[in-house]
Amino acid sequence: EAAIKYVAKLYLDGGIDGIISYGGSMGAAISSAVMQSLPLGVPKLLLTTMASGDVRPYIGTKDMCLMYPIAEAGLNSLTKQILTNAAYCITGMANAPKVSTKDDRPLIGCMMFGVTTPCVLRGSAFLEDKGYDVIINHAIGTGGISMEEMIEDGYVKGILDITTHEIADELYGGVLSAGPNRLTAASKKGIPQVVAPGGLDLLNFGTLESVPEHYIEDVRNNVRKLYKHNTSVTCVSVTPEEAYEIAKDMAGKLNGAKGPSVLCIPMKGWGACDIRTPDKALGWAGPAEGPSWISDPEKPEWSLRSCRYVQGIKEKIDLNKDEMEVLIADYHMNEPEFSDLMSGILYDMLQGTWKKGKKIRNKSIFPVKEERLYAIHKAGGA
């Protein structure tokens, strides 16, 4: 704590242009905490023998460079060259020219995962064409945490929160959790937010062997499905009942919003793996339905998971708020029309022209309160 305060004062007084440290686990633990306390953009270089392994505790969500120094201490013909390289690295960064910010455009946040890429790329391109810069964070846990921090620190002026799957990992034990505060900063800050359940059809784990046994047992009993993305990433599907609980969690967070907030729910799937019919343009080439897809018995083109999610949202969301809206969309997450819906709403919010109900223009988009959605679902059904 003393080091954090001391270095902060040095930085504020203009006494340092960068920071470098060298050590083992204890040295890395102390120095990385100091580095994490400094603003983004300040050069940070951490040399540690702990660099070969899980480095999340050291990096956190800051822009730190990590270098494996081979040895923990001592000077010899090898370490002299390594430390010289490190010294030139940090001095090079410290002497880098300051980037001009006079022509900077307002920054918009966006969350992406592989399964939501088409939606995100189209939406971000639209906003960039409208004069905004877009920062796209990878929704792998640290990405969500850093997005929340950037919003809290005032960098982000609005968020296109397409990919919220980190919430499922937090609630049900996946490895890509962003913690319990995901989806809270925009509400507290009062910035415009347009949200979707992108990627919430999957829980994420490492190798197949790392998937908890109770989930493997569910797969054997056809309670959920398993998708082996690659040798390092294995996913299991979120059940409709879990989606119902996730919806209530998200609704509770959105209820605290101090600014304009819209939740858009695509009923035909939440990502590339959640699709009824193969479509390369939407991210799934087949040959069969996506590995997390579950058809609603009464409306097979809709996802049962989406229907249960909507029920959870309707039970918990506060639609009496003038700046809160929930829209049901008869689209898949990665269809161009759905991306245009979300980015268009956010643009209207940023321009100050958004009004509740403005985007409800055709039979494919309607507010969650419309009872026709529930005519085929008994209370607590599905």
Can you say where each PLM-predicted feature lies in the sequence?
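Metallocofactor- and cofactor-centric catalytic cores in central/energy metabolism, strongly enriched
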Residues: 1-97, 101-188, 193, 205, ...
